[in-house]
């Protein structure tokens, strides 16, 4: 219980100051720096246990299954994923796996997000980097073709070197495409929602935005989409925007320039917009993030891009009686 409360206090402190913490790591010796939000990482371990091979295909992104603290989880080699191309799924990825010196243990990030727990092999963990969200820059369009982006944002290391933040939700979709297939199946069960009001949607992941657009289109609701919280806020508070036409805001939590927490804070603290419902759509579904979002007066918190959850909240806040 004490650990749980400490976690909530830590998240609260960071987001009240519009800050985030990133675990920096490399995929090769003396290579580029990459990062993932620390709240998506349970721990980093040295692993020298058994690896249960589940696929012998040359293009497999899953190395096999490992056991960490009595939990069996899939192991993914992040470097191999960086060379994966969704337009060429049969590409041989074996030459791109992370290579360690003989006798060296694997370094594995145990990641928890979107209700999944996975192991991600990296070359080495570096250190934790604390940043303001305003110090994060958008990376949409980098790290591959428009449909193959693997990076969502970038910032600078202590010495000025570039640090690139990985789109770990995109990795999950690429590794387990049936997750998206299930969402597409759920799409077919959705029914139209009758409303004249508009939804404002913010997410920095192109893959998530695409999925959310499909869901909202299927529901038949008007929506305006933004690549981060800053652009959403600029639109919302533009003098030409008719706030009375906005019936709902759906926002991610971690976004460059202005986070979802900043969106909630600014919208709820302004008398002109305080009545607009805000739903958090996040893969960081831990209790500390949910508690923090609700403490800032978010109206609901749902798991990332779940069609049935989206239908529920849109129906709740938008549908005309």
From Swiss-Prot:
Annotated Response regulatory domain ranges read: 198-319
Which SMART domains does the UniProt entry name for this protein? Answer: CheW, REC
Pfam families cross-referenced by the UniProt entry? CheW (PF01584), Response_reg (PF00072)
| Annotated knockout phenotype | Deletion shows a severe inhibitory effect on chemotaxis, although swarming is not completely abolished. Mutant also shows defects in mouse colonization.
Task: Name the domain of life this protein comes from.
Answer: Bacteria
Domain annotation CheW-like: ranges: 19-177
Instruction: Kindly indicate whether the keyword Phosphoprotein belongs to this entry.
Output: yes
> Where is the signal peptide, in residue numbers?
none
Q: What is this protein called?
A: Chemotaxis protein CheV1
Q: Which gene name does the record give?
A: cheV1
């Amino acid at each position: 219980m004490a650990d749980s409360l400490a976690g909530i206090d830590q998240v609260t402190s960071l987001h009240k100051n519009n800050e985030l913490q990133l675990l920096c790591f490399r995929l090769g010796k003396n290579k580029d720096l990459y990062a993932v939000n620390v709240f998506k990482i349970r721990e980093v371990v040295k692993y020298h246990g058994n690896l249960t091979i589940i696929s012998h295909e040359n293009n497999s992104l899953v190395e096999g299954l490992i056991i960490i603290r009595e939990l069996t989880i899939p192991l993914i080699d992040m470097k191999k994923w960086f060379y994966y191309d969704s337009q060429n799924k049969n590409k041989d990825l074996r030459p791109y796996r992370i290579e360690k010196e003989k006798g060296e243990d694997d370094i594995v990030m145990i990641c928890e997000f979107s209700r999944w727990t996975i192991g991600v092999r990296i070359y080495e963990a570096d250190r934790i980097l604390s940043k303001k969200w305003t110090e994060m820059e958008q990376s949409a369009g980098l790290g591959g073709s428009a449909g193959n982006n693997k990076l969502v944002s970038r910032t600078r290391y202590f010495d000025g070197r570039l640090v690139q933040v990985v789109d770990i939700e995109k990795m999950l979709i690429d590794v387990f495409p049936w997750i998206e297939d299930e969402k597409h199946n759920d799409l077919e069960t959705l029914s139209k929602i009758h409303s004249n009001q508009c939804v404002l949607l913010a997410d920095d992941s192109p893959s998530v935005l695409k999925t959310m657009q499909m869901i909202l289109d299927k529901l038949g609701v008007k929506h305006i989409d933004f690549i981060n919280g800053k652009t959403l806020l600029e639109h919302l508070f533009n003098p030409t925007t008719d706030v009375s036409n906005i019936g709902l805001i759906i926002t991610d939590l971690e976004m460059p320039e202005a986070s979802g927490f900043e969106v909630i804070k600014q919208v709820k603290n302004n008398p002109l917009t305080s009545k607009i419902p805000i739903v958090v759509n996040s893969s960081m579904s831990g209790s500390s993030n949910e508690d923090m979002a609700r403490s800032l007066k978010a109206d609901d918190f749902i798991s990332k891009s779940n069609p049935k959850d989206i239908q529920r909240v849109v129906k709740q806040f938008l549908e005309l009686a």
